[in-house]
């Protein structure tokens, strides 16, 4: 492994004590897991309680009534989803973000990241609520690999060189450049990070198949296609472009041919207006 990459992983900030305790309890309890103990662990951390209630009442989950207690959150989302979203939110809060090595405006990039989570929640909320809830943590961290590789490039002093090569190639070969400079591309790195933080294996495998969802096992193929569609639509350089909007529909059709049930009418209805407009235009 690239020494700088290894250093980046080793230097990742530790997870908060409460998050680690919850993760260890859920992962070790199996069928003996008790909801009351999950609630007791979370209740030790007032900041975590506040953040969970904020997330539960956000548009990500779309509950029809105000959620006011941790017991309600755990009951509504389930223990596994709670563990994963707590992990994702804790990780997301730990990093300074500067994606200038990619030639991207950081504020625009962060807005796009937020839109990804909003979309996957809105798209799947009525069609497959369980899937929507399961994938929110993945969507929250979808661009984390890019964020950390950007930090690594800045730290190593190679950010300007990387950016110049990226510009020379018109930002068309980002993954190849990432492999050249960092020894890994940002999507593969995200899978490595999910494994490092011990996310559920279903989420690790879903992330691992974002770019080849057809190769995913049947058990997580719908997860992989949903993430692949979101990744395509909100591709950081050209989010919602004519090409990416049409490619997302091609992915839905591919999923259908693979025996995965997505409602095309619902997908088209939930597309952002920019994507709907761009479906009528020629590709970039």
PLM ranges: what are they?
Residues 1-155, 181-183, 188-245, 284:
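Conserved alpha-helical "signature site"
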Residues 1-4, 254-284:
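Terminal helices and disordered tails flanking the catalytic cores of nucleotide-processing hydrolases
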Residues 245-248, 254:
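Cytosolic terminal low-complexity segments enriched in Ser/Thr and acidic residues
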């Amino acid at each position: 492994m690239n020494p700088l990459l290894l250093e980046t992983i080793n230097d990742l900030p530790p997870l908060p004590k409460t998050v680690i305790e919850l993760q260890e309890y859920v992962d070790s309890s199996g069928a003996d897991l008790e909801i009351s103990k999950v609630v007791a662990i979370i209740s030790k951390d007032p900041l975590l309680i506040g953040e969970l209630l904020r997330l539960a009442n956000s548009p990500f989950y779309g509950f029809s009534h105000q959620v006011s207690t941790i017991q309600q959150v755990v009951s509504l989302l389930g223990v596994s989803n709670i563990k994963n979203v707590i992990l994702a939110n804790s990780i997301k809060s730990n990093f300074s973000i500067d994606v200038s090595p990619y030639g991207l405006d950081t504020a625009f990039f962060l807005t796009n990241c937020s839109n990804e989570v909003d979309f996957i929640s809105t798209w799947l909320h009525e069609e497959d609520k369980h899937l929507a809830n399961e994938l929110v943590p993945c969507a929250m961290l979808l661009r984390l690999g890019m964020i950390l590789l950007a930090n690594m490039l800045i730290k190593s002093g190679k950010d300007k060189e990387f950016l110049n090569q990226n510009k020379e190639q018109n930002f068309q070969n980002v993954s190849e450049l990432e492999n050249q400079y960092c020894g890994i591309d940002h999507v593969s790195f995200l899978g490595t990070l999910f494994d490092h933080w011990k996310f559920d294996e279903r989420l690790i495998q879903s992330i691992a198949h974002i770019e080849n969802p057809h190769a995913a096992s049947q058990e997580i193929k719908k997860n992989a296609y949903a993430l692949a569609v979101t990744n395509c639509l909100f591709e950081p350089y050209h989010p919602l472009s004519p090409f990416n909007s049409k490619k997302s529909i091609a992915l839905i059709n591919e999923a259908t041919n693979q025996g995965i049930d997505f409602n095309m009418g619902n997908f088209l209805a939930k597309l952002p207006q920019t994507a709907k407009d761009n479906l009528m235009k020629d590709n970039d």
